[in-house]
Amino acid sequence: DLPIIFCSTSKITFPGSGVAAMAADENNMKVIKEKYKYQTISFDKVNMLRHILFFKDIDGVKAHMDKHKCILKPKFDIVLKHLKESVGPTGVATWFEPNGGYFVAVDVMEGTAKKVVQLCKEAGVVLTGAGATYPYGNDPKDSNIRIAPSYPTLDELEKAMEIFCVATKLAAVNKILENM
């Protein structure tokens, strides 16, 4: 009876105003429909129509995502290049190369994520808050930082990643010295 799949166009059309969908097998759909039949979600029908008229079908969604890829791939390439070349050899951070999505999750040395974000901010680079992927932003290891490269220009991103990598290494060195 699994999986139950959820998706949204929130990041690909209008942030906060996308259309969400759910897919499941017939048995799960019966249970879900029964459980939620008395709730009123008050869908924005005009917004749904906008999305249908814009995308038309799955091929329209795929074509639109290809446009996103043309814009985002060079930005993700910059992020990954800096991580691999500057931070990777030091061992003070790990990350996964995303296969889609809009973020790169970086795990810096335990106990340094907030410091990295602070150092970046002091240098003029604003990041998503440390631990933002955790409930209430509470990362028990203070190690997770989510990089969102979609907004800055390529030149801005190059500079921002240089600063991020220096801040990551500096915070790690300071943490090591604290523990000596």
Question: Residue ranges of each PLM-predicted region?
Answer:
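Conserved glycine-rich beta-strand-loop-beta hairpin in the small C-terminal domain of fold type I
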Residues: 66-80, 92-107
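Inter-domain helical "communication" segments and dimerization helices
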Residues: 33-34, 53-65, 84-85, 89-94, ...
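Short, solvent-exposed loop/turn segments at secondary-structure junctions
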Residues: 10-13, 26-29, 56, 100-102, ...
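Residue-level detector of anion-binding/catalytic polar loops
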Residues: 126
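PLP-dependent enzyme catalytic core of the Aspartate aminotransferase-like
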Residues: 122, 138-180
